[in-house]
Amino acid sequence: MKIQTKATGVLERTSHYLKAGILREKPAWFNVVGSHPPMMDLTKKPKKFDTQAQENDPSRSLFQKKKGGDLFKTRSNIYDRQQRHNSISRVPKLEFLEDQLRDVFYHQHPWEFSRPKTLIENEGNESSQCDWSHMLQLYKPLDGESVVQRTLWLLQDSKKTGKTMSLFEAYDQARFEFYRLRMEEEMSSTVSKEESSMYGAIYPSTNLDWGIKKEQEYIDAWTKVAGEKTKVRDANKDGRTANGSMGADDVVESKQSIWETVFDASDVSEASLEENSNAQTKDNA
C-alpha cells in the first residue's frame, strides 16, 4: 500500500470539493479541523530527500549526517530500536498475600491435595460470604483455604482491636485450630464406623485394598512355584557335585573363552606321529 503523505491537506482538498460542487454538505469535522489544522506531517522519511520540511519531526534525530562523509542515516540501528525504561511499559506482577499463605500451607501439608475438593463455584467469592470469626463453616468443608481466610481475618481483627499480632502468629493460631478440627473429624468418623460395625454394618473394601489383595494372591502363588524351583535347582547342584562331574577342572574350563585353545604336549606328539605314519604308507603305496 502506498504511503499517504497528503493527510495534512485534507482541509484544503475538502474546501476545493465544496467549491466545485463534488460535496454538497460540509462534513461534521470541517469547522473543527479548520479551527485547529494539523501542524506537521508525521510521515517519517529520510532527511536527504526532504531537507526543508519536517523541521519539528520527532524522528529527525534518526537521520543525522554521519561524521566525516556526505552520508545520511536512513534507518535505525539496534541501539535506537531497543526498549528503554522497561519498568514503565512492563505489566506489573500481581502479588497477593493469600497466594503466599496457600503456598506455605500446601508445602507443609502436601497430603491435603489428596482430599476431594469441589471445583464448581457460583460466583467465585463464596469464601467472602462466610463468617471467619471461627474456623468451621456451615457450607464450606475444612481445607487449606479455611486456614488462609482465618489468618487474614485474625490480622484484620488485630488491627481493629489494637492487639499486636504478626503474620506468623496469626498463621500459627489458624493452623492449630485447623489441626484440632481435623482431629475431631477423624475421631468422630472412627467412632461412627465402630458403632455401625457393632450394629452389623459391613463396609466393602476400597479400590486400593482390592488391588493389594489381588496382588498378594499372585505373590503367594509365585512363592510356592519359586520354592519348588529352588529345591529342584539345589538338588541338581548337589547331585552333580556328588557324582564328581563338577570338579576343579570343569570350573576352569567353564571360565575359559571359546576363542582360547589349550593343547597338551602328548596330544601334539601323538598327532604328529600319526601324520608321519600316514605319509609313509602313501609313499610306499
UniProtKB/Swiss-Prot annotation:
Listed GO MF terms: structural constituent of ribosome
Name of the protein in question: Small ribosomal subunit protein mS23
Swiss-Prot/TrEMBL keywords: Mitochondrion, Ribonucleoprotein, Ribosomal protein
GO cellular component, one term: mitochondrial small ribosomal subunit
Primary location recorded for the protein, binned into one broad class: mitochondrion
Subcellular location: Mitochondrion
Lineage, top ranks: Eukaryota, Fungi, Dikarya, Ascomycota, Saccharomycotina
Pfam families the record matches: MRP-S25 (PF13741)
Family according to the record: Belongs to the mitochondrion-specific ribosomal protein mS23 family.
Highest taxon above the source species: Eukaryota
Source organism (scientific name): Debaryomyces hansenii (strain ATCC 36239 / CBS 767 / BCRC 21394 / JCM 1990 / NBRC 0083 / IGC 2968) (Yeast)
Membrane-spanning parts: none
Entry keyword Ribonucleoprotein: yes
Subunit structure: Component of the mitochondrial small ribosomal subunit.
